[in-house]
From Swiss-Prot:
This is F-box/LRR-repeat/kelch-repeat protein At2g29770. Gene3D superfamilies: Kelch-type beta propeller. It comes from Arabidopsis thaliana (Mouse-ear cress). Residues 31-78 form the F-box domain. The keyword Repeat applies.
Amino acid sequence: MVFISETSDDGSNGGDPTKNPQEEEEENLPPIPQGIPDELIESTVLLIRRCHYPTLSLLSKTFRRVISSSELYKSRFILNLTDSVLYALIGFSPYNTTNLYILNCNIPRNISLHLREIKSLPPLNHGSAVVTIGYHMYVIGGHNRLHQPTSNVSIIDLRFHTSCSLPRMQRTRVYAAAGVIDGRIYVIGGCVKRNDHWIEVFDIENRIWSSVPHHRYCNGSSLRGEGFVTSVVMQNKIYILDSLFGFAYEPRHGTLQSLGFETQFMFLWRDPCCVIEGLLYCIDPMCVLGHAIVVYDPNELIWRRVKGAYILPKFCYYQCKMANFGGKLAILGCSNSSQRGLKDVWFVEIELENRQSGEIWGKVDSLAIVLRSVKSPSIDLFRSVTF
């Protein structure tokens, strides 16, 4: 009987009798890469919702590096893969400081919405003015912990919830008006005495504050130099509301115009308010036009009611805040809880429809209790950021 071996004279192991075929096969495999290329990680991370980035950053240093790169956010913007996130400044008695909370609505519908305090950030000054540019939030002035007005300015990187200090303003300010026009931050008032530093402008690129000494006050201007109730940016002007009057500051011409009660604009302008697609939305508790939500068209100079079968929670309208949430109207407000001794913070998301007739209709897209507390919360700010 003859036995035929399947092993040739060369040997399938390369002629090395000390190696078996399995070891030889493993040696011939291509080398395993030591790490995943950044380009591959970025192309994958781009498709993932930003609310998951904090978890992804824990996987490795490479993931953290990619998620922290500005190139990732530029790519998200170019590919229209940005997310809108809501932030709120909320304080509790005695209201000396406020904390920043995040409300992420880009989650599956089966998960409850919840305001989450960002504990990596220090408490922020009560009465500070806040503006956002991209993923940066600028916190300007306000009362410090000793309840004294401050000129401090800080910037928050909303990608990673970190903050750092910026150069101080030339004056201390509380409840100042602030707005971004032509890439520059204008800060108005918030201080009792009016002088050449009453309006300051911040150069974002060079990080330099400058006063605007040559602003001209138009007839009827009655600014008392106190803190303001609210302000919005519309048609390249900063509209300012105090307890008695309204004003419009136009940086390009350096004019500050008074808006008297006789003007149509002042008829229903209240806080809370926000601007969506060039229109000013407000809550009118008296429902003068038949609905609680009204809208002002600065081109037609007319107020209209926002129609629709929407029902708002029974909260104190004057203590609410509104925000432009990706073209939708977002409202954050407080009410007494069904549980005795507790306070509820409600979130309302209203989808807006601009019909051909010029009418605007609203439909509640989301309604939820997002925070419950034994203390009475004070909502200083409600702002949407998209990046």
